[in-house]
Amino acid sequence: MKANNSFSLTIPSKSNNEAFARAAVAAFVTQLDPTIEEINDVKTAVSEAVTNCIVHAYRDTIGKIYITAQLFADNTVCIRIRDAGCGIEDVKQAMEPLFTTGGGERAGLGFAVMQSFMDTIRVTSRVGKGTTVTLKKKISLRVKADA
């Protein structure tokens, strides 16, 4: 299916860019007229994915985070967040709740949070090459009231 609209954004993996990425994607998704809950779901999932890039993919270095979002005729949004960082050795294990490579401060809930807020999440990764997180959510069609 061909996207009706799309946008791309590339940002440095700095923690202060996480809020910008979240807001940019949320603003783009408003074209589908989401509920407050739906927009918050998208913002939370994007925040978790971008934070994973900052904390895990590049660790103590600065790299690029590539974000694309697409809107489809069936009111679905597809968001891809990609890095060219260290990659994930075992994606299945990494997606288990409480698994973390980030040390004591990290809760290991990022992927679980993304899964709880989005309809589908797909993670592909190659060690030494990077990771792509694909998030999809169908935004409910709302009946417009006559003015």
Where are these regions (language model features)?
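Conserved short strand/loop->alpha-helix "switch" segment adjacent to the catalytic nucleotide/phosphoryl-transfer site
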Residues: R22-S47, R106
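Conserved polar catalytic motif of the HATPase_c/GHKL fold
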Residues: E48-N52
